[in-house]
Amino acid sequence: MSSWWAAAYGYRHPDLDAAAHQQIDEFSHVMFGGLTHAPAALLTDTLLAMVPEGLDTVFFCDSGSVSVEVAVKMALQYWRSHTDTALHRKTKLLTWRGGYHGDTFTPMSVCDPDNGMHTLWQGIVQPQIFLPTPPPDTETSLRPAVEDTSVEEYLEHAEHVLHENADTVAACIIEPVVQGAGGMKFHKPALVRGLVELCQRYNVLVIFDEIATGFGRTGTLFAA
């Protein structure tokens, strides 16, 4: 399990240990308050060479929860920056049940509202819009699973929800291919592709939370 996802490359790997020691010997920390430094620039260039064309900016965060907070703030700021004030109403988030995105306030609002670890905060965090738990991929599931809803049926329901709420939805946030802390539940890549196409059709941004799936953890560099 690699500490769920924090140690995907193993424990005490000599290359990682050596890199950490080398960095500490050079300098341990420089804040990004209007500054940068050579290791950050090198890491940025390395990351941009890995990601799909069109992704050309990196924002460094110190945890998964903070990365979700920042991604949501970017989505909200995007709509708020438009001169068309009707777009300023796009403040809600769309996600599906069974997910987990972190423990700070905004991520808690898009974790499973009934069966997750944050049910205590119902009525306090901002209410969001939830699709049903995605139907399992019966071929890759880690436990016996029955696909009681087809991808086509699920996407038909998702389109209905988007049609009814697109004017107020800023972004859709999901864990692609596998819901991590929500139970290691796999769903079909076709479901992700279909949901992205619907979001594009209804003018909704898409946020992929790949804290648990990115950088080779699911077999490819990124799951999305």
Where are these regions (language model features)?
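Conserved N-terminal phosphate-binding loop of PLP-dependent enzymes in the Aspartate aminotransferase
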Residues: 1-224
